[in-house]
């Protein structure tokens, strides 16, 4: 049997060899040969309603599974519509392979119809990108793309394929082991540094483990828990790291940073040792950098050497895969335990008592009202039915922060959100990808009325594939986070933030063939959530919440993380 194939068929064969089961995309003229082969159904294609959402859905697939997500777009506007999703996955280190069509090779550079310099445009927002010149070059490019996307620090890779490459023919030769000269990463970590770090952990009197998304990417949640329990250290998880340590774990404090808890931020301020694992000391965590953790030494473990020392100098830098480093580190920590465990027992106990006191002094307490639905009330109801086990894909804004504060996650890969880029419109298509990847799992799309209206066409995708998504719109009639800043820092001059028009949820969902309802009574919230969960298919809930609620605690721009605004200003008697 001849292995002479068209480029389009070679591409599908490569996807099958990479164990790609499904992809998200939107066809166009130059990708027609590829879609003709996809018609055979060996790789399931999900048709979205906008290319940006194809990339977000691929991210949701990847974030919830750890596998590479795949998206596809045609040339020109199709490819440029992917850019926001590529930047989003780049900033959050999500493995995505984007396939784009391109005009025929002879027309490149001629301003042909639907031509764009996709290769040039995406150089800054991908780990790597390819422009394939011949059908015979496809196997190497595709397999290298998957290898680069998933290895080292994960990220997006784009493969740009001209139409004549799709239509051309070549003998398909499977690619063996990928070896890329110049592309190197050090997964193991330096043994001497690991031993120094283990010793420093036992020496510390007020340690804190700072776990980021890198712990989840590395599949190191179990090893993180082992370390936390062995050294009996309090721990925090970043917005991207939530679920790396179960929310129910007695050593877990909460999320730190701009909208983190009082206890987490105070712990950072007074700690004498930060054990940073797969976290990058982002500005949303540190606040004013010069004032961050002034008494702390730092152990920093990250697969990407660029991140170590970029924002906060590390006393013990360890370049390596978090899982492999923790495997070794846990052995050394356990080896040192008999001689070291008792040296700071009293100080460690006092440290944990101090953190417990901070947690009791200013707990994350939801607002409650009989007159209107408080946003935290809605979030708590989602938490009640999820029980720490459901996937929640959040959009960007106040609802995202309340979700991070009040929803429990007992496992990694349950909390999906656009952390670094903060892309509004992310929540719904990401939930689509997560639901497709996890058909037996309960998935919530937690969105605001602003972000939801950016991705509203994807209701058609949800209906088309009868995805049992539970879409919860936290509708406060505003771009809530922007309004909060205008209220607090711009003398309440509310400029261009009112979202006065919102479609009738029942009619909107009904137009797509599934149920929806609007909830305005606080007493109805729990029942509405229960009804949505019991329904076997998709369900849209439009929950009208208090329009002027703010997310607290809040660290103002330029402030240290212990300079928190803990609640609304108290009225002054005159």
Model-derived features: where do they sit?
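Phosphate/pyrophosphate-binding active-site segments
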Residues: 1-2, 136, 174, 295-396, ...
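Glycine-rich phosphate/diphosphate-binding loops that line cofactor/substrate pockets in enzymes
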Residues: 8-20, 60-66, 90, 148-153, ...
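Active-site diphosphate/adenylate-binding microenvironment
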Residues: 11-12, 16, 20, 26, ...
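A short, small-residue-rich loop immediately preceding and capping a beta-strand
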Residues: 21-24, 44-46, 64-103, 210-213, ...
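Glycine-rich, anion-gripping cofactor-binding loops and their flanking helix/strand elements
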Residues: 63, 213-299, 410-440, 455-456, ...
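Thiamine diphosphate
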Residues: 99, 107, 113-114, 265, ...
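Glycine-rich, acidic loop regions that bind phosphate or pyrophosphate groups
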Residues: 100-141, 241-350
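Conformationally flexible catalytic loops at phosphate/diphosphate-handling active centers
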Residues: 144, 148-203, 359, 364, ...
């Amino acid at each position: 049997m001849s292995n002479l194939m068209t480029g389009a068929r070679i591409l599908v064969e490569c996807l099958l060899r990479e164990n790609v089961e499904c992809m998200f995309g939107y066809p166009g003229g130059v990708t027609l040969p590829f879609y003709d082969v996809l018609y055979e159904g060996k790789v399931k294609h999900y048709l979205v309603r906008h290319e940006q959402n194809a990339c977000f859905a691929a991210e949701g697939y990847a974030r919830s599974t750890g596998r590479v997500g795949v998206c596809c777009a045609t040339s020109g506007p199709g490819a440029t519509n992917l850019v926001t999703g590529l930047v989003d996955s780049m900033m959050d280190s999500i493995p995505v392979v984007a396939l784009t069509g391109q005009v025929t090779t002879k027309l490149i550079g001629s301003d042909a119809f639907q031509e764009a310099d996709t290769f040039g445009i995406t150089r800054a927002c991908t780990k790597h990108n390819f422009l394939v010149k011949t059908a015979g070059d496809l196997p190497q490019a595709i397999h290298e793309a998957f290898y680069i996307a998933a290895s080292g620090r994960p990220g997006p890779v784009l493969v740009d394929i001209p139409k004549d490459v799709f239509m051309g023919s070549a003998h398909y030769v499977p690619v063996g082991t990928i070896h890329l000269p110049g592309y190197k990463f050090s997964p193991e970590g330096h043994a001497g540094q690991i031993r120094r770090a283990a010793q420093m952990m036992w020496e510390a009197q007020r340690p804190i483990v700072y776990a980021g998304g890198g712990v989840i990417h590395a599949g190191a949640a179990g090893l993180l828990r082992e370390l936390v329990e062995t050294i009996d250290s309090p721990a925090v998880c970043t917005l991207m790291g939530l679920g790396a340590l179960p929310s129910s774990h007695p050593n877990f404090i909460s999320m730190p940073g701009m909208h983190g808890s009082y206890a987490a931020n105070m712990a950072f301020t007074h700690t004498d040792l930060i054990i940073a694992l797969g976290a990058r000391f982002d500005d949303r965590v540190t606040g004013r950098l010069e004032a961050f953790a002034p008494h702390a030494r730092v152990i920093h473990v990250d697969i990407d050497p660029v991140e170590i020392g970029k924002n906060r100098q590390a006393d013990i830098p360890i370049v390596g895969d978090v899982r492999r480093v923790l495997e070794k580190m846990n052995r050394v920590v356990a080896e040192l335990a008999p001689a070291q465990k008792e040296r700071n027992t009293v100080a460690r106990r006092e440290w944990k008592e101090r953190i417990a006191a901070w947690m009791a002094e200013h707990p994350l307490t939801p607002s409650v009202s009989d007159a209107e639905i408080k946003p935290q009330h809605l979030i708590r109801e989602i938490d009640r039915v999820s029980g720490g086990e459901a996937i929640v894909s959040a959009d960007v804004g106040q609802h995202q922060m309340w979700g991070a504060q009040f929803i429990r996650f007992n496992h990694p890969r349950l909390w999906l959100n656009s952390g670094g880029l903060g892309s509004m419109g992310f929540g719904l298509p990401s939930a689509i990808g997560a639901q497709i990847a996890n058909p037996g799992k309960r998935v919530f799309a937690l969105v605001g009325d602003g972000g939801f209206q950016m991705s509203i066409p994807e209701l058609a995708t949800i209906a088309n594939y009868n995805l049992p998504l539970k879409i919860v719109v936290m509708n406060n009639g505003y771009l809530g986070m922007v309004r909060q800043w205008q209220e607090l820092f711009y003398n309440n001059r509310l400029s261009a933030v009112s979202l006065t028009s919102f479609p009738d949820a029942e009619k909107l969902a009904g137009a797509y063939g599934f149920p929806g309802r609007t909830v305005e009574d606080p007493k109805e919230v729990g029942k509405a959530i229960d009804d949505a969960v019991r329904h076997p298919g998709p369900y849209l809930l439009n929950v009208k919440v208090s329009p002027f609620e703010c997310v607290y605690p809040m660290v103002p721009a330029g402030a240290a993380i212990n300079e928190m605004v803990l609640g609304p200003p108290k009225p002054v008697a005159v």
